């Protein structure tokens, strides 16, 4: 059964199935799907995350998806386990992340494929990139101050949304 902290906001149209843990101050937008329904699978969403509209998170049997603190999964992205995302990461619109480990503060922009690699902390992956070999992952550039500021703004905006929607629901 899913476990959801009482300070998290989960849209009524979100589908959360199986061994899923959602920690505090998390925003789960409409039409999100999280499935940890295969044997031995789990999904952990750490505090302060925002999971935007139409995101799909799925953990294969015997695997986990862990989304680090204050991480943003933007509209329509797919995160498929096994996968571990560090703290303060951003996964852009329509991106696919599968069988990966991302260090803290990584920014993956829109329509990107990241598969079967380990991404060091503070790396930037541009729009439409395909990172499916470790030699490509090892050559990624570092995020800029502007990239980090953008991620902080996204997290802050969605935390306000989560709190506002929670207040409306409790009326």
Spell out what each predicted region is.
Residues 1-3, 37, 42-44, 53, ...:
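Glycine-rich hexapeptide-repeat left-handed beta-helix
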Residues 1-33, 39, 48:
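Extended, small-residue-rich solenoid/repeat segments and analogous flexible loops
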């Amino acid at each position: 059964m899913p476990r959801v902290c009482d300070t998290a906001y989960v849209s009524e149209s979100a589908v959360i199935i199986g061994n899923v843990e959602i920690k505090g101050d998390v925003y789960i937008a409409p039409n999100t799907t999280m499935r940890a329904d295969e044997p031995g699978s789990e999904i952990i969403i750490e505090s302060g995350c925002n999971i935007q509209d139409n995101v799909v998170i799925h953990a294969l049997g015997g695997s986990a998806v862990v989304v680090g603190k204050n991480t943003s999964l933007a509209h329509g992205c797919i995160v498929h386990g096994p996968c571990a995302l560090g703290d303060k990461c951003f996964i852009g619109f329509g991106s696919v992340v599968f069988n990966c480990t991302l260090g803290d503060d990584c920014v993956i922009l829109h329509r990107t494929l990241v598969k079967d690699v380990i991404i060091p902390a503070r790396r930037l992956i541009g729009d439409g990139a395909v990172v499916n070999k470790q030699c490509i992952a090892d050559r990624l550039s570092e995020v800029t101050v502007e990239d980090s500021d953008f991620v902080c703004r996204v997290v802050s905006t969605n935390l306000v949304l989560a709190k506002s929607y929670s207040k409306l629901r409790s009326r």
